[in-house]
UniProtKB/Swiss-Prot annotation:
Biological process, per Gene Ontology: cell division; chromosome segregation; DNA transposition
Keywords: Cell cycle, Cell division, Chromosome partition, Cytoplasm, DNA integration, DNA recombination, DNA-binding
Subunit structure: Forms a cyclic heterotetrameric complex composed of two molecules of XerC and two molecules of XerD.
Keyword Cell cycle (UniProt): yes
UniProt subcellular location: Cytoplasm
Listed GO MF terms: DNA binding; tyrosine-based site-specific recombinase activity
Pfam families: Phage_int_SAM_1, Phage_integrase
Name used for this protein in its record: Tyrosine recombinase XerC
InterPro entries per record: CB (IPR044068), DNA_brk_join_enz (IPR011010), Integrase-like_cat_sf (IPR013762), Integrase_catalytic (IPR002104), Integrase_recombinase_N (IPR010998), Integrase_SAM-like_N (IPR004107), Recomb_XerC (IPR011931), Tyrosine_recombinase_XerC/XerD (IPR023009)
Amino acid sequence: MERQLEAYCAHLRNERQVSEHTLLGYRRDLDKVIAYCKEHGIADWQALQIQQLRQLIARLHHHGQSSRSLARLLSAVRGLYRYLNREGLCQHDPATGLSAPKGERRLPKVLDTDRALQLLDGGVDDDFIARRDQAILELFYSSGLRLSELTNLDLDHLDLAAGLVQVLGKGGKARVLPVGRKAREALQAWYRLRGIGNPRDRAVFITRQGNRISPQAVRLRVKAAGERELGQHLHPHMLRHSFASHVLESSQDLRAVQELLGHADISTTQIYTHLDFQHLAAVYDSAHPRAKRSKGNDS
């Protein structure tokens, strides 16, 4: 089973061009399935049946795994079995018809517009790290990139004169996104210190040693910026969520936001309509003279 899993992971990495972060998530989930199979004497993928997979899901749910995590595990299992069936290594899919237990869908955390501007409009030292980090923050918020999309950017993916960036999203799907004026200015300032012709790596964002910056390093730099400028926890995906929420709030164009984010299914994008409603409700509560009743006037 491990050998076939290794072959599947190699397929995802080399042919599907899945990011290392996503690949590690798939591997962790499928390792749980292998551990369950070993525990129950299941020697190969063909022998795993729907009843056993359902039992594993129930056990993990009982031990506190979220519905979202279990849905991701089932998605990983389905992907593996699609590969095994296509390669003639298996003739069924035990995940067919299975779904994760329903859970409450949490709304993504976002910065409001004022907080986003507070983060980005602070003073920036004219040094290598500060200029790089500012360009990272501006590009996340300007274009709504995923972490893997940002760290995989090469110099020829950006056209600052045209204000465009080409990214490779999930499933190897390419899309072209606009880059705002402030982000272009931050990138130009970063390029002056980066030394375009010197470092070995063609990555847009590099370390002092000239190597492509890692996703973990970006997470730490974004976290540090959030603590320094806002006094709060901040992660790259919160900037992507903020980008989506603010564009939707201004444009009311859900399809456009779907395209910008690279979502295959618009239902994934629709969660931002709930955030927009929360904003509208807050505006209503603060602005409408009869939106709130004072205490003691409830009779």
